[in-house]
C-alpha cells in the first residue's frame, strides 16, 4: 500500500486512534478526517499526542468533516452522514459516521455511535442507510446496533471488531440477535482474526487470518 487517500478517525478514544501516529509515519496520507467535538467537563479528548503536528509535518491536510460532505475515493465516494456534534451527550455519540459507495457496494461505519445517534441517522436518512457491509457499532455493544437501526441498514454482512475474551462482553447477544433478525452474516475478529472484504462481480467475499484473532481490537 503506497499511500492513503484518507485516514478517518471517528472519535478520540484510544482504541480508535492509538496507531494513528504510526500510520502517519509509515505511509503518506493525503487527508486526515476528524469529527467535530469538544470535551465536556466530565470527558477528555483522547487524541494521540502531537497528532496535528505530525499530520501537518507529513503533508496531510487536516479536515473537520461535516454532515453532507462528500469526498472522492477511487471509483466511489465517501459520504459524511454525521460529522460529530458539539451538542452530543457523549464522545461516542459524536462519532464520525461515514458511508462509502462504489457502484452497488455500500460500506457503513458509525464508530462508537450509540442508540441516540443511531436514531438520528434513521430519522435523517431512513432506508438510504442500507449497506452491503456494516462495521458493527461500538464493537457490537448492546448500547448500539438497535433493531430499528439494523432494519434501516439491512446489511448483507456485519464485521465485528473486538478482542478475544474482551472485558466488555463484545459482541453482546442482543446485538447478535438483531443482526440475525435482519439476516446479516456476521464476521468477528475475535474468532476469525483479521478480516479482508473483497467486492467483485457484485459478490462480497471475505478473507480471514485466524492466527491474528488473539490480537484483534
Residue ranges with predicted function:
Residues 1-217:
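Non-globular, low-confidence helical/coil segments that flank catalytic cores
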Amino acid at each position: 500500500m503506497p499511500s492513503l487517500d484518507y485516514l478517518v478517525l471517528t472519535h478520540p478514544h484510544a482504541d480508535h486512534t492509538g496507531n494513528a501516529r504510526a500510520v502517519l509515519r509509515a505511509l503518506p496520507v493525503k487527508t486526515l478526517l476528524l469529527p467535530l467535538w469538544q470535551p465536556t467537563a466530565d470527558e477528555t479528548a483522547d487524541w494521540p499526542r502531537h497528532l496535528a503536528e505530525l499530520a501537518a509535518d507529513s503533508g496531510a491536510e487536516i479536515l473537520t468533516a461535516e454532515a453532507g460532505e462528500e469526498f472522492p475515493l477511487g471509483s466511489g465516494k465517501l459520504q459524511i452522514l454525521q460529522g460529530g456534534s458539539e451538542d452530543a451527550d457523549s464522545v461516542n455519540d459524536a462519532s464520525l459516521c461515514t458511508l462509502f459507495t462504489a457502484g452497488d457496494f455500500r460500506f457503513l461505519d458509525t464508530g462508537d455511535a450509540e442508540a441516540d445517534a443511531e436514531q438520528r441517522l434513521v430519522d435523517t436518512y431512513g432506508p438510504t442507510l442500507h449497506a452491503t457491509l456494516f462495521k458493527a457499532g461500538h464493537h457490537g455493544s448492546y448500547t448500539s446496533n438497535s433493531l430499528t437501526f439494523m432494519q434501516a441498514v439491512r446489511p448483507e454482512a456485519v464485521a465485528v471488531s473486538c478482542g478475544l475474551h474482551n472485558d466488555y462482553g463484545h459482541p453482546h447477544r442482543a446485538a447478535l440477535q438483531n443482526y440475525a433478525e435482519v439476516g446479516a452474516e456476521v464476521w468477528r475478529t475475535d474468532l476469525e482474526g483479521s478480516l479482508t472484504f473483497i467486492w467483485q462481480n457484485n459478490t462480497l467475499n471475505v478473507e480471514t487470518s485466524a492466527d491474528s484473532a488473539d490480537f484483534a481490537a
